[in-house]
């Protein structure tokens, strides 16, 4: 039987390495955060600015290319079939789902005006969905597990929603900062709180997606590494004990796949809700700001 002798932790090139020393040899324990490492393929630097082409850039391009090719082959002239195949059914399912989501979550507008938001919502949903799903493929990279990527996406959408709010309502868009019925002495404090709350929408949109994807992938990686370490111990008792973590990893794959789909759905719903708030000002203020 392999006996535990020593567990060492090394820091090399800003990476942590765990080594388990047994009588039969050394078993490396992979770090669960190693899968999120950014690797520059084409380093580019201008002054203090870095424009390197990295693995997140590669997988984002692959995801975007896959989405565009899939939609192109289905929607091009003669591309659709009377009896749809699996890929055509997938595109049609998403194409039917997004307009229903827009109609349900964005109110107070005509159907034609609502459909102006359809391209943005459709591209955002499909991009997030395919980014999350391709992260489930072994040895791939989960783009949405990096905070700066999700934060950049959420802030871009947040700025666009704010511009839409000003385009439709002018300066009266600022009336959401002061709900009706608020005592005048409390108005400055409430305006500040509402402004902070509004700005935190962009943070919450990015943090929610990043945290869920990173936590789920880290958990699967930890259990997978534990199962692999037990398999490397060359002992029947450890092999039998490895079946538990192995079955847990297989069982977690299904919920993690559900999380990948649901997070794209939740993020899209949040964007639609923010668009609804920007286009339909349900809150009125005591002092109206006219155009």
From Swiss-Prot:
Keywords: ATP synthesis, CF(0), Hydrogen ion transport, Ion transport, Membrane, Mitochondrion, Mitochondrion inner membrane, Transmembrane, Transmembrane helix, Transport. It is found in: Mitochondrion inner membrane. It comes from the Eukaryota. The keyword Mitochondrion applies. One of its GO terms (cellular component) is proton-transporting ATP synthase complex. The chain crosses the membrane at residues 51-71, 117-137, 146-166, 173-193, 213-233, 239-259. PROSITE patterns: ATPASE_A (PS00449). The keyword Transport applies. Its main location: mitochondrion. It is a multi-pass membrane protein. GO terms for molecular function: proton-transporting ATP synthase activity, rotational mechanism. Belongs to the ATPase A chain family. Mitochondrial membrane ATP synthase (F(1)F(0) ATP synthase or Complex V) produces ATP from ADP in the presence of a proton gradient across the membrane which is generated by electron transport complexes of the respiratory chain. F-type ATPases consist of two structural domains, F(1) - containing the extramembraneous catalytic core and F(0) - containing the membrane proton channel, linked together by a central stalk and a peripheral stalk. During catalysis, ATP synthesis in the catalytic domain of F(1) is coupled via a rotary mechanism of the central stalk subunits to proton translocation. F-type ATPases have 2 components, CF(1) - the catalytic core - and CF(0) - the membrane proton channel. CF(1) has five subunits: alpha(3), beta(3), gamma(1), delta(1), epsilon(1). CF(0) has three main subunits: a, b and c. This is ATP synthase subunit a. It comes from Vicia faba. The lineage of its organism: Eukaryota, Viridiplantae, Streptophyta, Embryophyta, Tracheophyta.
